């Protein structure tokens, strides 16, 4: 490394120091998904970011999705995916594959990436330590012709109803980094597949996390000119939904952010997971890397 490169690194570390001190001993939940999960280079950068958070005294917790991988496995096994109102129906055979893919292959791949940095990651799902309990999701859809709402039966798709933070508190006091798959049991004995965004929001809310980061395939919330909005209050976010600035798939993402804040998260960030080291850029730089939503 040249003297000039060393000088640049030293300057960057000096600039990051106040933010390292701000987040020391604080919990940051990161929902890992989107394009970053399918790109080896971005995956390694993400693992490096999580390791550096831990080394800086932060308590990072990773929650991950895996929709495309689930779809690919179902296709390989010759199981046709069924959808209701645009949402995947998860029957008994499908939920077994969902658990196998999420809590098995994907979870362990992420754990291995983080472990390669020298840190200790541990793979979990909602079943471990009775961490999360779920119940059958109650989803409705409005018929555009009759304007009548009907209930969707999505099978074993669940909503989080309870989070027990005991295991996560224990891990926070250790050197372990939890990597959690969004699968959880119900009190009825069934296994439920849970949307990874809402699962991450429930975990972050139960822990009163300082930050919840959603890694997506977009820079964050954009205004009508296509420019990134750096910060929004909950009231401002709701107004942008109402006037159509926030639309399409960004609406449920922002609504999940709002629910997480109502549950106790101090701030939620939507940022671009396709940018290498976006987690560090968000946490350890002055202007962050995405859209911060606060109370």
Swiss-Prot record:
Substrate binds at residues 66-67, 88, 193. Signal peptide: none annotated. It catalyses: N-acetyl-L-glutamate + ATP = N-acetyl-L-glutamyl 5-phosphate + ADP. Its main location: cytoplasm. It is found in: Cytoplasm. GO terms for biological process: arginine biosynthetic process via ornithine; L-arginine biosynthetic process. It is an enzyme of class 2 (transferase). Its EC number is 2.7.2.8. It holds the Pfam family AA_kinase. Pathway: Amino-acid biosynthesis; L-arginine biosynthesis; N(2)-acetyl-L-ornithine from L-glutamate: step 2/4. One of its GO terms (cellular component) is cytoplasm. GO terms for molecular function: acetylglutamate kinase activity; ATP binding. Keywords: Amino-acid biosynthesis, Arginine biosynthesis, ATP-binding, Cytoplasm, Kinase, Nucleotide-binding, Transferase. The record marks 31, 253 as: Transition state stabilizer. Coiled coil: none annotated. InterPro entries: AceGlu_kinase-like_sf, AcgluKinase_fam, ArgB, Asp/Glu/Uridylate_kinase, Glu/AcGlu_kinase, NAGK-C. Transmembrane segments: none annotated. Belongs to the acetylglutamate kinase family. ArgB subfamily. Catalyzes the ATP-dependent phosphorylation of N-acetyl-L-glutamate. PANTHER family: N-ACETYLGLUTAMATE SYNTHASE, N-ACETYLGLUTAMATE SYNTHASE, MITOCHONDRIAL. This is Acetylglutamate kinase. The lineage of its organism: Bacteria, Pseudomonadati, Pseudomonadota, Alphaproteobacteria, Hyphomicrobiales. The gene is argB.
